[in-house]
Amino acid sequence: MEEFPGYFELDRSRQHDFLYPLIFRESIYALAHDHGLNRNRSTLFENEVDYDKKYSLIIVKRLITRMYQRNHLIISANGSVQNPFWGHNKNLYSKILSEGFAVIVEIPFSLRVLSSFERKEKDIAKSPTLRSIHSIFPFLEDQFSHLDYLSHVLIPYPIHLEIAVQTLRYWVKDASSLHLLRIFLHEYWNSFSTPKKHITLFLKGNSRFFLFLYNSYVCEYESIFLFIRNQSSHFQSTSSGVFFERILFYVKIDHLVEVFVGTDFLDIRSFFKDPNMHYVRYQGKSILASKDTPLLMNKWKYYLVNLWQYHFSVWSQPGRININQLGKYSLDFLGYFSNVQLKSSVVRNQTLENSFLINNAMKKLETTVPILPLIGSLSRAKFCNALGHPISKPTRTDSSDSDIIDRFVRICRNLSHYHSGSSKKKSLYRIKYILRLSCVKTLARKHKSSVRAFLKRLGSELGDEFLTEEGVVLAVIFPKASGRLYRGRIWYLDIPCINDWVGDAEGSIFTK
């Protein structure tokens, strides 16, 4: 253990994160707002008295005070709240409090992020394309073709409130704030959760607060896991650790908590010897890929299960971690179906006397668009029926023609932009056809005309509007090839965040 003293010491600055006084400091909220830490939450700083319409610092203060006054929170046997202050607005007040807690608890972390960004500004400027979600796919194309086994891991969530609070103890050394957080979670947990949903970390009404709790849990888990991986591998990891989603992408995990108490670390390190292990996390899941035998993958599998069970008190069955051969498994990853296929390459060898062909088999990562889930999403958004036949949108007939066309064109281009890396473009053309014809039917319904007559009157103008972005880009880069259909894959390096619609049947892309 003497070899790694730096890994098991907390940053001394973290020992002075006293957050409790910040709850009642209006200047702290203004500071957070000025630093851009609370975007799209400007209403939190408006001191209005209309509780049903505005978030305000005054409301947060009052609610925190009443949380400590236990006589105001007496609940009768039938579950109704006796105090008229809470009444039927208890869910609203819990949301307001969660917003206030999220702002405050992010302050010490976010200020360190800003200072880290200033130190690493030059390095970030050299590699701006790493911000893109699509940047992971070229990496997978280069690496997965040389690997044999893949383990798909579903990261378990801490189902007990105390686990989330205890995880924060390693990062926030303020007992008063943690005590207040514990009271808040126990008082309002029923407001957040529903009987049908046991995992409520990503409820839309409280996503910011619970996203912070979830990321703190994942950060500690990955700190331990990546430390073991780096020390057991022949090659040190060069990846950056992620704490806040899309905020701390470039921040290295420099400080780890002490977790190997009473464990012979050298034995653990010698237990996992893999020269080529890769780790990717996305949407509450992670991927482990290796070139070695399934025995090593099983070792990592049971190590993760024991780590979650004994360190985080989170029960995870080994069956939640699947080990598959890359050549026989299709991975549903970030809106794509990805699998490794053997592609034959024929080379003709000519000698002085003979000529013969050499057939070389090469592994290649194929990415395709999941057409059925996309059609299902379009059907639920009323762009087509269950069979994929386009229908009109009656809710849009009150808008102007330009607004209707702009909406459909924006949706089409968003889909084309993200799914441009598909190996098979035919399914993507079908999605474009559904959106284009749905737009025409909506306009024809508005003008009380037939689709044929409306298309004849409109001409080719609508087709030019639906010209996708990759078509414009290719026309500039490859002017000679722009006339014929381009079937290659395009990965855009300007997608900094992933929208909810990727992997979600009822995504926000259809409502924007």
UniProtKB/Swiss-Prot annotation:
Keyword tRNA processing among UniProt keywords: yes
GO molecular function: RNA binding
Keyword Transmembrane helix appears in the UniProt entry: no
GO cellular component labels: chloroplast
Matches recorded under Pfam families: Intron_maturas2 (PF01348), MatK_N (PF01824)
InterPro entries: Domain_X, Maturase_MatK, Maturase_MatK_N
Keywords tagged on the record: Chloroplast, mRNA processing, Plastid, RNA-binding, tRNA processing
One GO biological process term: RNA splicing
Record PANTHER family: MATURASE K
Function: Usually encoded in the trnK tRNA gene intron. Probably assists in splicing its own and other chloroplast group II introns.
Name by which UniProt lists this protein: Maturase K
Species for this entry: Oenothera argillicola (Appalachian evening primrose)
